[in-house]
Amino acid sequence: MKTKLTVLITFIILVLLGFWQLNRLKEKKLFLASMQENLTSPAIDLAKIQDNLPYHKVKITGHFLPDKDIYLYGRRSMSSEKDGYYLVTPFKTDEDKIILVARGWFSNRNKNIITQATNDQPHELIGVTMPSEKTRSYLPANDIKNNVWLTLDLQEASKVLGLNLENFYLIEESKDISNLDILLPLSINHLAAIRNDHLEYAFTWFGLAASLVVIYRIYKRSVSSRGLETRSRIKQDKSSF
């Protein structure tokens, strides 16, 4: 009886997990459709989308803050030199908001030249809003002393730069004001290619539930078979007296 109850509870949990993944599948489809629409639509003023900020194409006007650059380490397969950094600079808008902007990628050998990229000339830029990155336990901590960042944690960046940063950053889509050839532009195409694996996850949970039923039935047959053999042996022993 105890085994049957355990199997039943486990089966219910597995089935519920399967339906939960189907619900997540629906939510992810709606999210991806909304994100695709946002990314392909014309850029709109940031002030008009204060809710649900991530993954919107926006335009902002203001200027970069010099001497505040962050070098975010990242490999780039399309470049002949794989190792390099994303140039991330705080941008102060005309509304006095300060937003980190990922402006482009440069190779490791150009690290000393890239300091020429930032000036405080007023201009308008277009970019896609992105959520703050989370520190991963398997990644080393950011090397603040040498300005080598592995994670763009906006709370940490606020403390290091001494700025009150917004809780999102931008990937710049418009041509950077620096016009430096060594600063390669960034692409947002990968954002529309986010995988939606929740259907596979649902099949996995439902499959485990079905497997549990099969295993339990095999187990019951095995127990019943052993019980029949035992009773048969007892009868034979009694008949021998």
Curated annotation (Swiss-Prot):
Pfam families: SURF1. One of its GO terms (cellular component) is plasma membrane. Disulfide bonds: none annotated. Its main location: membrane. It is a multi-pass membrane protein. InterPro entries: Surf1/Shy1, Surf1/Surf4. The chain crosses the membrane at residues 5-25, 199-219. Keywords: Cell membrane, Membrane, Transmembrane, Transmembrane helix. The keyword Transmembrane helix applies. It is found in: Cell membrane. Belongs to the SURF1 family. This is SURF1-like protein. It comes from Rickettsia bellii (strain RML369-C). The lineage of its organism: Bacteria, Pseudomonadati, Pseudomonadota, Alphaproteobacteria, Rickettsiales.
